[in-house]
């Protein structure tokens, strides 16, 4: 059976008090609507239509060709919004789910189960519901004496008795697609808001003797909509708890989950330890038996087995097996560290390849460079790679030793088994097996201060 989805993303989000389009506010580093799209796609949907309004181009820019789009010029209610997808879906067979673009916590598993329940019951419509302690603001699920759905009533149209009901509509539905678009034309706006409500489609189906199901989820957080910055923070916290819980169940030690931020696209191997205050973002891959020390930040990087990152920042870089970084080091984009490398305190690496066993232990800048196997770079070494207009490359061969306080003025190549004396400023290439000294000879004037 064909499956379709409509994502409602046209709301202005005035309560966010922001210039940014509501569904583009981020949770765990991604726009809310992108989380929704990924869950919808993951549930086995064949085609997605996103309803956009104010800020339409911004949404299209984020979602791209993963969705079709329909424009809702005036926000006249959820039924009116769904009707905007008519040109894409009206004649389609199968099941259509309707999901709000501001529900970033909804999972593909819940959507899969909703669809399966709907199709197994041969229903014309199914609503996803939940029971919550504070149902204010949500539509209430009103059931008849036999426990079947009688109607969904919105907060502003509810009687006091109906407001006391704690089973609420999530705003997420599954429909027989053709029934949905047939009934949408019959929805009226005679309610307190003067809007066209999507739940009225369910009442129309029931009035015609059709089957309407309710599928209740036990995970209330999944259906939480985000309407303001407080709720955005709550969604962020919920997403982080979910992510950390997943990693801990898969063999990762997170010492203080409440202070640890891990993005949804991060992968972490077993027996890795994450210390307090760590942030790991983007498409980062971390191997097994890694230690990420407290207050480190890692973005879009690869950390191989057994590595240790101590109080450092790693951006768009790769760290080899058993390599040690930090404390207080920075790996900038393009830094590639091999196995058993050491990058120590107050070292900055940018667009540089440090081969296996290389060491840069203290107070150095290595940029646009290749450092050979087992080479030691002394404290205070600087690759002078920029002349104000262009960047130039430094190459240091294997098994070389660069002394402290050395300037390597690029472009320059240092060979294998080379010793560069401390305090040198190297401007010319140095061949293999050489000693390079480039500093003024010391002059001592005894008794000068007497």
UniProtKB/Swiss-Prot annotation:
Quaternary organization: Homotrimer.
Organism: Staphylococcus aureus (strain MRSA252)
EC numbers: 2.7.7.23, 2.3.1.157
Record's keyword terms, sorted: Acyltransferase, Cell shape, Cell wall biogenesis/degradation, Cytoplasm, Magnesium, Metal-binding, Multifunctional enzyme, Nucleotidyltransferase, Peptidoglycan synthesis, Repeat, Transferase
Reactions catalysed: alpha-D-glucosamine 1-phosphate + acetyl-CoA = N-acetyl-alpha-D-glucosamine 1-phosphate + CoA + H(+); N-acetyl-alpha-D-glucosamine 1-phosphate + UTP + H(+) = UDP-N-acetyl-alpha-D-glucosamine + diphosphate
GO CC, one annotated term: membrane
Cofactor list: Mg(2+)
Top-level lineage group: Bacteria
Family: In the N-terminal section; belongs to the N-acetylglucosamine-1-phosphate uridyltransferase family.
Residues engaged in binding UDP-N-acetyl-alpha-D-glucosamine: 8-11, 22, 72, 77-78, 139, 154, 227, 332, 350, 365, 376
Binding note for cofactor: Binds 1 Mg(2+) ion per subunit.
Region (Pyrophosphorylase): 1-229
Known function: Catalyzes the last two sequential reactions in the de novo biosynthetic pathway for UDP-N-acetylglucosamine (UDP-GlcNAc). The C-terminal domain catalyzes the transfer of acetyl group from acetyl coenzyme A to glucosamine-1-phosphate (GlcN-1-P) to produce N-acetylglucosamine-1-phosphate (GlcNAc-1-P), which is converted into UDP-GlcNAc by the transfer of uridine 5-monophosphate (from uridine 5-triphosphate), a reaction catalyzed by the N-terminal domain.
Name the UniProt record assigns to this protein: Bifunctional protein GlmU
């Amino acid at each position: 059976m064909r499956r379709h989805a409509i994502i409602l993303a046209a709301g202005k989000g005035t309560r966010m008090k922001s210039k940014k389009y509501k569904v583009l506010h981020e949770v765990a580093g991604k726009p809310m609507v992108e989380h929704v799209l990924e869950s919808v796609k993951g549930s086995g949907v064949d085609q997605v239509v996103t309803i956009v309004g104010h800020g339409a181009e911004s949404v299209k820019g984020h979602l791209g060709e993963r969705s079709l789009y329909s424009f809702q010029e005036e926000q006249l209610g959820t039924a009116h919004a769904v009707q905007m997808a008519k040109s894409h879906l009206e004649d389609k067979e199968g099941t259509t789910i309707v999901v709000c673009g501001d529900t970033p916590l909804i999972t593909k598993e819940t959507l899969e189960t909703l669809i399966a329940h709907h199709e197994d019951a041969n229903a014309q419509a199914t609503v996803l519901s939940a029971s919550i302690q504070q149902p204010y603001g949500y539509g209430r699920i009103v059931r008849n004496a036999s426990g079947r759905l009688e109607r969904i009533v919105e907060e502003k149209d509810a009687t006091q008795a109906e407001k006391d009901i704690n089973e609420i509509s999530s705003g997420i539905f599954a429909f027989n697609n053709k029934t949905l678009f047939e009934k949408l034309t019959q929805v009226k706006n005679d309610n307190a808001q003067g809007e066209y409500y999507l739940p009225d489609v369910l009442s129309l189906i029931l009035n015609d003797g059709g089957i309407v199901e309710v599928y209740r989820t036990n995970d209330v957080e999944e259906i939480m909509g985000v309407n303001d910055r407080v709720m955005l923070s709550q969604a962020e916290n919920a997403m982080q708890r979910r992510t950390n819980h997943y990693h801990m169940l898969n063999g990762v030690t997170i010492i203080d989950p409440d202070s640890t931020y891990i993005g949804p696209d991060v992968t972490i191997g077993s027996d890795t330890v994450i210390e307090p205050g760590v942030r790991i973002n983007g498409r980062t891959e971390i191997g097994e038996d890694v230690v990420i020390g407290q207050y480190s930040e890692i973005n879009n990087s690869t950390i191989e087995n057994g590595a240790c990152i101590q109080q450092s920042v790693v951006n768009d870089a790769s760290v080899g097996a058993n390599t040690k970084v930090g404390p207080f080091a920075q790996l900038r984009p393009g830094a590639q560290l091999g196995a058993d490398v050491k990058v120590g305190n107050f070292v900055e690496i940018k667009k540089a390849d440090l081969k296996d066993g290389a060491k840069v232990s203290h107070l150095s800048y290595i940029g646009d460079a290749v450092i050979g196997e087992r080479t030691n770079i002394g404290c205070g070494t600087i690759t002078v790679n920029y002349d104000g207009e262009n960047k130039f490359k430094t190459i240091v061969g294997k098994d070389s030793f660069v002394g402290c306080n050395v300037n390597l003025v690029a472009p320059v190549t240092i060979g294998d088994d080379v010793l560069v004396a401390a305090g040198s400023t190297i401007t010319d290439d140095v061949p293999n097996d050489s000693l390079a000294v480039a500093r003024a000879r010391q002059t001592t004037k005894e008794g000068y201060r007497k």
